[in-house]
Amino acid sequence: EDINFIPSEEDIRNLSLIENFLNEEEIPYEKDGSICGLYRINDVKGNAIELRYINSYHFPMDNSKRFGESCKGVQWDYFYNISRYNSDHNIRVIWIFDFEMSQTNDTTSLWQGERGYHRQWEVIKNTIRTACGRIRHRFRGGDFIVKEVGNKELRKFLDTNCFYGYRSANINLGLYLKKDKHGYKKGDLIMVLTFGYNFYGNKKRPDDPFIEIIRASTRIGCQVIGGMSKLLKYFCINYPTLTIGSGKNKHEIKVRELKFYCDASHNDGRGMSHSALAFRFDGWDYGFMNRYTDDVDEDGLHGVKGEIFHRKPHFHKTIMRLIGEGRIISIANAGTSVFSMTRDELLERFSNN
């Protein structure tokens, strides 16, 4: 069941930004007459998409059983259930949270420095453009060579073009242009795929660990047809093992299985299983984050009002106490859709193609 809310001044500004963007891109939309923040559009194939703007303060996760009525909210699977229901009816949902539109970071991008860059909102807009066929620069895998990306260049790229920004990995691969095209220069980095060991996910399978595709990101305004296949093929052929750990714990592990956790709040993971890659769909995982509703400086935990943060196991007791006091709220999301494929299966498919 949808929960409606009365928009604040900030919400009205954000809704105007969404509508202005859709108008600028000439994307037809239908604005729902009763549910605030719900817009209906269609992708390039005519399939339905729902854009759902959310003011997170109206949708905290329910903690009333533990802390009483003052901590009442939506169930932990609220967004997940809406996305799953719509997916079962061939409707894609792209969630747009208020804090994603207000997020900023100072970035030294690949082409210029920018302060107060709204990376997450820019990536969401690019996701919508891609779905609706409004991407300006299309490339093919054959336009590129594959090379490892240095950490400095990777950080600049991900902090500009990836929704969650930079995260370290064991292997970083990039697509670099062979020659000038679409206003970009020979040697420009257009797409990256990074790989690493998932420590949390492998706790239950230390003797048969999987490798995670940690970041998959394309430069904003661009699309690379066949780009992911090209990067995966290069990885599978050239990296039968990965070196993980450091010091005395440094060792090699065989690359047997790859897993990709697709952000279900924004991305359409169906392409992972319906494309030529045909990854297996392993299921959905739930997700949530936390938000400070007040400035916090207690027991080593520091945060400012409105700031978003993820799990902090060392501060669990403090966080739970502050949730009970209403100074932190937990916010659910649509979770992740999980896909997997073994290296041998991928190599066989690449050889057949």
Predicted regions and their residues:
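A short acidic/basic microdomain associated with nuclease active sites
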Residues: 19-40, 258-263
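Short, basic/aromatic recognition patches
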Residues: 140-142, 147-169
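Acyl-donor binding region in acyl/amide transferases
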Residues: 98-108, 112-123, 145-148, 169, ...
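Conserved beta-hairpin
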Residues: 38-43, 158, 170-193
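Short beta-strand-loop-alpha-helix junction that forms the active-site gateway
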Residues: 35-36, 41-79, 197-201
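Conserved N-terminal entry element of GNAT/NAT acetyltransferase domains
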Residues: 2, 92-96, 106-113, 127-149
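Acidic-basic catalytic patches of nuclease active cores, encompassing PD-(D/E)XK
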Residues: 1-31
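Catalytic cores of nucleic-acid endonucleases
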Residues: 61-118
